[in-house]
Amino acid sequence: DLILDSLEAIGLVPTGGLIALNSYENRVYQVELDESSQYGQFVVVKYYRPQRWSDAAILEEHAFTCELAELELPLVAPITRDATTLFNHENFRYAVFPRQGGHAPNLENTEDFKVLARTLGRIHSVGAVRKFEHRPRLSIERLGQSSREYLLENNWLPLELETAYSSLTEHLLN
């Protein structure tokens, strides 16, 4: 009900048809809409994991995605309603995307590989124009050292693996 209610809160009319989609970090659903929807028969709704990203980081990512879409890169940008792409319903943050079919490229096919490489190059060229202010930086300190310390300090590892993990990760991170 929460999923359907959140879509109704932004003016969409779901039929009740709902399928959970695979996602590593967030909760993502395909939702069927009433026939009169301007977004087609289905949308994909992404609910962001609490406390993982700030609103500013999500909106910055959405703005970048919209910029890429305006430059005709092959991607799906979030739907904008009332001048925003990030919505909140009962303390759940979410974005809505048009559903778009596709398929994985055949990386053994030279032409597919070249198209993918050119597309990634274009994305990086657009992203290099400005500094992203709100997205956490990828760093050995944040993703390596801090994670290592957290696991060791909070006894998350089986006792018999702790010494080996400590030694190995110290060697890898230094």
Outline where the language-model segments fall.
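Conserved beta-strand edge residues that scaffold enzyme active sites
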Residues: L21, D82-A83, H134-R137
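ATP-binding glycine-rich phosphate-binding loop
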Residues: I10-E32
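A cross-family kinase active-site recognition segment
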Residues: N106-A164
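Short, P/G- and charge-enriched loop/turn segments at secondary-structure junctions
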Residues: G16-G17, T84, L173-N174
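ATP-binding pocket architecture of kinase catalytic cores
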Residues: E32-F132
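Short, non-transmembrane alpha-helical segments in secretory-pathway proteins
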Residues: D1-V13
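Short, conserved active-site entrance elements at the starts or edges of catalytic domains
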Residues: L161-N174
